[in-house]
Amino acid sequence: PPYADSPNVTANGGTAGGRRHRARRKADKPRQERELMLRCMYHTVPGRVLLKMLSGRRFSALCGRFMDSSLSRPLIRRFVRKNHIDLNEYTATRYRSFNDCFTRRIRAEMRPIPHNPRALIAPCDGRLSAYRISDGLVMPIKQSWYSVSDLLGGDPIAEAYRNGVCLVFRLCVDNYHRYCYIDNGTKGRNVFLPGQLHTVRPIALSRIPVFIRNCREYTVMDTAAFGPVTQIEVGALLVGKILNHDAEARVHRGAEKGMFLYGGSTIVLLLREGAADLPDALFEK
């Protein structure tokens, strides 16, 4: 037909705008389903009961054992296909379990380290949010809100980062889930903070405010280029899915620091004022 060459009309007679709208609706569907599930779990009595069960240590441990076992292997093919993961970028293409696939090791040439020692490298793959640290700063991390002090469990060291920078790296499920040291230096001990689920009224009531604290693990590093830096890994609700390799040790830029198993997916870096020269465009308003 004469209108088929129009940029807004497809050859089968449908409008390109309508086609894009349907594509957006299809892309938004998983997000809408997740939001509906969260509303049900946080704001209904059955959902609250289920949340208590799912956030329990026994259930999380059982899930962890399943993900580590060969019984979870059938999940791998769908996971790889759904998330468009190119296994050729990794050192192995066959895996013993789902967690073995989830923590797959990437080829070194896929993540080259810049030669400039003053270049601040990302500790992991992910989407970055940057914040200037002030007294009123609270950040959304994994369905909860944290101040810097909250993230560190009230550790007084938080005060050292006043007017500094907080970098939050949110890993997506298809990202590489191992992470590295950002610089040469020494690291202190790993401090683990267990997750907590607080409700302010009995679970029998229909709507109950919930306060969640995910499990975290943090360490302070004395780095060559950026001075004292604190790195925080954020895991699942109650049971940690964080595996750090080293206790107190000398560390090297780009060397693997640890990895997330399924359920852990955020890294936070705290830098002191003036430690790194970052562009203003990087920071959220």
Give a label for each model feature.
Residues P2-Y3, N12-K285:
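Contiguous, well-folded functional domains in the mature portion of proteins
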